[in-house]
Structures are given as C-alpha cells and as structure tokens.
From Swiss-Prot:
One of its GO terms (molecular function) is threonine-phosphate decarboxylase activity. This is Probable cobalamin biosynthesis protein CobD. Its main location: membrane. Keywords: Cell membrane, Cobalamin biosynthesis, Membrane, Transmembrane, Transmembrane helix. Belongs to the CobD/CbiB family. Converts cobyric acid to cobinamide by the addition of aminopropanol on the F carboxylic group. GO terms for cellular component: plasma membrane. The lineage of its organism: Archaea, Methanobacteriati, Methanobacteriota, Thermococci, Thermococcales.
Length: 290
C-alpha cells in the first residue's frame, strides 16, 4: 500500500467525518478491554506492577496484530481497513471541536465542557484556571493525538501508529500516581514517557515560527515531564500564564476566553505545518527507497 495515499485518505476522513462511532472505534475497544483487565488484575506492590506490564503487553500486542491484518487482504479491503485503523490513531478534528466547546461565558457550562477533556477536579477551578486547563489540554493533546501517532507512522508505518495509540490510551487510563494506580499504572506510564520523549520536543520545534520566546519557556518546563514541553510552548506563543496548581506554572497574563480561540488558531497553523513536513519527508523517503 502507498503510505501517502493511505495518510491522505485518513486525513480526509478525519477532517470531513471526525471520529468513527464508539461501537467500532479500535481505541475505545482498547480502553474497554484494558478496563476489564484492570478490574480483575489490579494489585498493589510488585504484583501490581507486573500485572500492569502484562495488561500493557496484551493491549499492545492486540494493536500490533490488528495493524497487520490489512497486509493480508486484497484491494480495496486492504486500503479500507488500513485507512480506518490509521484514522483511529489520531484525532485532529475531534480535538479541535472538544476544546472549541469550552469557549462560553457561562462558567458552569465551561466547567462541564472542560471536565470532558481534563482529569483534574474542575469544581475547584476559577474562570482563569478553567481557561488555562482548556488551553493546556489542546497543547498537550496536539502531541498525543496528532504529532506522536503520525511520527510513529512515519517511522514504522501503521503498526507504529497503532502501538503508540494503545500505549497512550493505557497511560491516560492508568498513569496516575495515586493509591489505585501507583503500581499498576507505572509500566504503561513509563513506556508512554519513552515513546513521547522525541515527539514532545518535536512539537515544541513546530512552535518556533511564532518566535524564539518558545525556547525560553521550554527551559522552564520540567525535564522529565513530556507534557510540560508543548504546554510551555503554547504559553509562550499566547503570552498567557498556564498553570496546573502544584505541578507547573508558565508566566504571562491571565488567560481569557479569547485566548482559547487564539490557541485554536495556533493549533490549526501548527497542524498544517506538521502535515506539510510529514508529506514532504514521506515523498523524499519514497524517492530514496522506491
């Protein structure tokens, strides 16, 4: 299969139609299976760590073997399934729409929409911190939902994108340092850290056309925390503070509703920039290895 055609059609699907229905969405099923295993196998201590590692292995293996199925099919079924699977590994339109819904003057409605895209307790957040949380989610998920899966598609094809999405899903479900997931979630969380190390920093580089201030803010981010990097870059571009109380704070003025709109405009430009780079590199790769 031609990877340029595959990627192009998957992008058209994403931009025109958005996400597949939840009932047939591979990532949703990864989550359901992982949740089922979590309820039965989660333990504390070393046993919990091993159980979490085993669940990770199962879900990653499922994603990997699922991504191989198109190669055993004939045209056009091979393309149809591959496009569907690749599309499920990234979410450009869906991320934009979820964050756009947080733009509202009704603070209770804002709490409701922000709660759908962040894990923190929105009940204790004031208006500025709700705006900050929405922008932070957009910046972090630009890496998780766009840059990283397509980065691994570039390197390893469909299996790379699907395996990354599986690991990232497990991290989103179990990657918490609390009593429940301190041990069970440690393995998928560390694996997600490894897989996101390069993409998170690549995401920061995509912001450089907006100014070198991005590099100054990059230095303020915690070295070991990948998600800080894109958030720091977005803070620099918008000139607003972004804060997760007790974790990080990047300087600037107070974020407002209009700044969420500005962040969405930045998001569109960065995505367009990244997709242009991906297509150019893929063309070069195909020319060098026809």
């Amino acid at each position: 299969m031609n990877p340029l055609i595959l990627l192009g059609l998957a992008l058209i699907w994403d931009l025109l139609l958005g996400e597949p229905p939840a009932k047939i969405h591979p990532v949703v099923w990864f989550g359901k299976i992982a949740g089922f295993l979590d309820n039965r196998w989660r333990r504390r201590g070393k046993i919990g760590f091993l159980a979490g590692a085993f669940v990770t292995f199962i879900i990653v293996a499922l994603a990997f073997f699922l991504s191989l199925i198109p190669s055993y099919l004939t045209f056009p079924l091979d393309y149809l399934l591959a496009i569907y699977l690749l599309k499920s590994s990234f979410a450009i339109r869906s991320l934009y729409e979820h964050v756009a819904r947080t733009v509202t003057e009704d603070i209770e409605e804002k709490r409701k929409t922000v709660s759908m895209i962040v894990s923190r307790d929105v009940k204790v957040l004031d208006l500025a911190h709700l705006n900050s949380a929405a922008i932070e989610s957009l910046a972090e998920n630009l890496n998780d939902s766009v840059v990283a899966p397509l980065f691994y598609f570039m390197l390893f094809g469909l299996p790379g994108a699907m395996v990354y999405r599986a690991v990232n899903t497990l991290d989103a479900m179990f990657g918490y340092r609390d009593e429940r997931y301190e041990y069970f979630g440690k393995f998928p969380a560390r694996l997600d850290d490894i897989l996101n190390f390069i993409p998170a920093r690549l995401t920061v580089l995509l912001y450089l056309p907006f100014g070198v201030k991005v590099l100054k803010y990059y230095k303020l981010a915690r070295f070991k925390i990948n998600s800080d990097k894109p958030i720091a870059a977005m803070s620099a571009v918008l000139g607003v503070w972004l804060e997760k109380p007790g974790a990080y704070r990047f300087p600037g003025r107070e974020p407002r509703d209009e700044d969420i709109k500005r962040a969405l405009d930045v998001y569109k430009l960065v995505v367009a920039e990244y997709l242009s780079i991906v297509f150019v590199l893929k063309v070069v790769q195909l020319c060098l290895n026809p």
